[in-house]
Amino acid sequence: VRRWHRAALAAAAVGALTAGVVAAGQASASVPAEADGGNYAFAVIGDIPYGDAQIANFPKVVEQINADPAVRWVDHLGDIKNGSSVCSDEYFALIKADFDRFVRPLVYTVGDNEWTDCHRPNNGGYNPLERLARIRQVFFPRPGHTLGQQSARVFSQADQGFPEDVRWERADIAFAAVHVVGSNDSLLPWTGNAAPTPEQTAEVLARTAAVIQEIHDTFADARAHHDKAVTVLTQADMFDPTVTDPKFADYYGFQPIVAAIARESAAFAGPVYLFNGDSHVYHSDNPLAAGSKWLSFYGIDRPVPNLSRVTVDGSAGANNYLRVTVHPHGPQVLTWTRVPFAS
């Protein structure tokens, strides 16, 4: 069964990469719509809020980020709840109301805790696909627009059924937020099952093809516009350093996505940055550099030295936001610092 899944994922990857550059040469959406040129910053958070204390404090987190004059927009990398709480409509509405407190544009990419893992009895025993549909309804009511009071336009895959996959451009940097989640990208069997269901597998195949197309289109846009860097944001940690002996059976859902990022990064002249949550502990590395175990693990045939990745703090360690400063004309395009929460 697992071998068939891998073959199907590979076929989806080939289909996405041969579909063509849908939007290359288009004028890119910009977040936010204001003059570019100088240094600016954006904030990144993820795996928050977890538990009652963080839920109660989350409005203060929003207020603090709103008060940061350098931040032009915010990225939430998914997991808006912990993995052992109920995936209820009421909870989704609560977090959406908190998200609506953000003054500047908010780009939210979906995590596994809010849909993939909702089959668990302590999550309410939901059908994850029903919860995914509800997430899209609640958090993506205006496809092609970010959340936040100062909503900004972005390119969206809503016409393919994936409003959460978006891309935009700002000051010669191409950005993409793509829906890749933990739990082997949602291929871990649901409660009571020994293997993924046909419906579960079909969802993963379709979403994987869309993600690969979005990655492909983002790099195509970057080359067409002579961008200096590409930044990809997602939930899943596909290179989890906290796992000392990773098993491919737990990661094979990520393989075609890693291959697409590696292939596009290797062909791109500038730096590529990958931001993710999922593993909860801040980490910065070059996951596909020469000598990395992940090269052979994912079947990548050559190093990708221009790919950097950053994992944000989350869960119990979610006590800061990442302020990422963009230097469009500097030797290092992105720099970042962790800003402690005030309370």
Describe every region a protein language model picked out:
Residues 1-30:
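Secretory targeting and sorting signals
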Residues 30-91, 227:
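N-terminal active-site segment of His-dependent metallophosphoesterases
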Residues 38, 54-62, 77, 88-98, ...:
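Stable alpha-helical elements in mature extracytoplasmic
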Residues 41-46, 72-78, 82, 105-110, ...:
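Structural recognition of the beta-strand scaffold that forms the well-ordered cores
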Residues 50, 63-70, 100-104, 137-144, ...:
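Sec-exported extracytoplasmic/periplasmic mature domains
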Residues 66-73, 176, 192-287:
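His/acidic metal-ligating clusters that form di-metal
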Residues 86, 91-207, 289-318, 322-325:
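Extended active-site neighborhood of metal-dependent phosphoesterases/phosphodiesterases
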Residues 320-343:
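A short C-terminal boundary segment appended to hydrolase-like catalytic domains
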